[in-house]
């Protein structure tokens, strides 16, 4: 599929993707029936190749931004700034609006990690 080609072009580290066919089905443990219950659906399977190289945050942000760019009329951010709350800021949705690369976002997060590691040093019991 076109989406699978574009995802593979991202060359995300430690992970591979392949096309997948499946049929959603409800179980007795669910309180609701899946949206496409019993229908044949197409999807993309994520295959972890190297957990040391895999960057889950970069992967998920890259996928969300790619899908938002490829399908802007069908992609919608959750109401109530849900994604902003999950990410701790509105940087992801701003990057999406500005059509920026997730790699740039990863650089900002790396700086945040560095700042936090410096901040916590005085509080560490062991070094």
Q: What are these model-derived regions, one by one?
A:
Residues 1-108:
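Conserved functional hotspot residues or short segments at active or partner-binding sites
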Residues 113-127:
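Structural signal for terminal/edge beta-strands and the immediately following C-terminal loop/tail
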């Amino acid at each position: 599929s076109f989406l699978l080609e574009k995802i593979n072009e991202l060359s995300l580290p430690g992970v591979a993707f392949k096309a997948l066919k499946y049929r959603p089905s409800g179980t007795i443990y669910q309180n609701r029936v899946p949206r496409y219950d019993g229908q044949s659906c197409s999807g993309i399977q994520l295959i972890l190749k190297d957990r040391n190289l895999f960057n889950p945050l970069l992967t998920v942000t890259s996928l969300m931004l790619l899908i938002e760019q490829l399908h802007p009329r069908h992609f919608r951010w959750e109401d109530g700034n849900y994604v902003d709350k999950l990410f701790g800021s509105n940087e992801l949705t701003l990057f999406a609006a500005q059509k920026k690369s997730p790699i740039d976002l990863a650089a900002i997060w790396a700086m945040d990690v560095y700042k936090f590691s410096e901040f916590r040093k005085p509080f560490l019991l062991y070094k």
